[in-house]
Regions:
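Intrinsic-disorder/low-complexity accessory segments
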Residues: 1-370
Length: 370
């Protein structure tokens, strides 16, 4: 380790430009492929969808040859832009413009027939539409939670987020939106008419995304196949004998998870995790002691915490034990629609980058959740 004096003696130049190993497009390609692992991939996809590009979402792996004769393998989540499906779009020029804006690799394929896995014309290539996303706001809804999601979608993905005041929901045609996000807040003031409005939209094909305490309302409404455990579970766990009035601040503090890192076991084959990680574990940033338990149904749980999940920061041992083996991510069908539950603030303050793409996946990958 260098001392400050030794470090000052190092002759170095500032980095003013980041060199990216970009992949030039080949004009004779049959199709182009955008892998999903890059953090900028959602922004590129949003840009192309806004320009009317026909996009196919890969839901199974495949291997093919590029126009230079290289053999390339692609994981689920890769986006395919087929030249034949884009007769009204100058695809080559549009993709090059996107590459100029976002230095990222887009690969050129020589043929629609693959060496291994699905072909480009397979029904496992799902068509994607431009998402139209709204989030409930208003009295009783956490502005911090809304702001964190808005910041990610607006500044990093370039996806416009519509703010819907829940008190004016009756005046809104929800069919104008593909996704609706519900964050921490109070929603018991939504009357039966507005509840039925959301449920009808959901059953007809909408995607409902819940986060943190917004999940309590989704569970109470019977839309979420998971149960939010009572706050008394945490309160009782940290209660100690002979507690006095002077101990009340300690008692309250022990219940809090005010910003610590917890490790979850994840399913990297699940659409919510495509392009996020290839590992079996992923650290989540927790800011609450919310406990979610998914129903005992196959494949709806995309992530759950390890037995003793705390890896950084402080969480009372009793609460850490309670968090262990509870659910972090859930996704399932509801009629023709989908419900996605995200326990933690995956876009917390715009700096916890490891989980931020889960929000993008909840939007762009939702057609693959079956």
């Amino acid at each position: 380790r260098l001392s400050k004096r030794e470090a000052n003696k190092i002759n170095a130049s500032p980095i003013t430009e980041l060199a990216i190993d970009s992949q030039p497009l080949q004009p004779g390609a049959v199709a182009y492929v955008l892998p999903w692992h890059d953090a900028k991939a959602p922004a590129v996809l949003q840009t192309l969808l806004e320009q009317g590009v026909n996009v196919r979402l890969t839901t199974a792996p495949f291997t093919g040859n590029d126009t230079l004769g290289n053999t390339l393998s692609f994981a689920p989540g890769a986006m395919v832009f087929n030249v034949g499906l884009n007769p009204h779009v100058p695809l080559f020029d549009v993709l090059n413009e996107a590459l100029a804006q976002y230095p990222i690799k887009i690969h050129s394929l020589a043929t629609g027939l693959t060496i291994e896995g699905i072909d480009l014309g397979s029904p496992s290539m799902l068509p994607l539409e431009l998402p139209k996303v709204a989030i409930l706001t208003g009295v009783g809804v956490s502005s911090n939670a809304v702001g964190a999601i808005w910041h990610y979608l607006d500044t990093r993905v370039g996806l416009p987020l519509t703010m819907l005041d829940k008190d004016r929901l009756a005046d809104v045609d929800l069919s104008d939106f593909t996704h609706l996000i519900v964050v921490t807040g109070v929603y018991n003031d939504l009357d039966e008419k507005r509840q039925a409005q959301i449920e009808s939209w959901l059953e007809s094909g909408g995607t409902l995304i819940g986060q943190r305490m917004g999940l309590s309302w989704l569970s109470d409404m019977g839309w979420l196949q998971a149960t939010v455990k009572s706050r008394n579970t945490v309160r009782n766990a940290v209660m100690f004998e002979n507690m006095q009035y002077a101990d009340r601040d300690i008692y309250r503090a022990l219940q809090q998870v005010a910003g610590s890192v917890h490790l979850a076991q994840v399913d990297p084959t699940h659409p919510l995790l495509w392009g996020v990680t290839n590992n079996q574990t992923l650290p989540f940033f927790k800011t609450s002691s919310l406990l979610l338990q998914a129903d005992d149904k196959p494949v709806i749980e995309a992530a759950k915490y390890t037995s003793f999940p705390l890896v950084a920061g402080y969480t009372a041992p009793e609460v850490n034990k309670l968090i262990g083996n509870t659910t972090a991510l859930v996704a399932h069908r509801k009629g023709k629609g989908r419900v996605i539950a995200i326990v933690d603030p995956v876009n917390f303050r715009g700096y916890w980058r490891g989980t931020e793409k889960i929000m993008a996946n909840a939007i762009f990958m939702s057609p693959a959740i079956n």
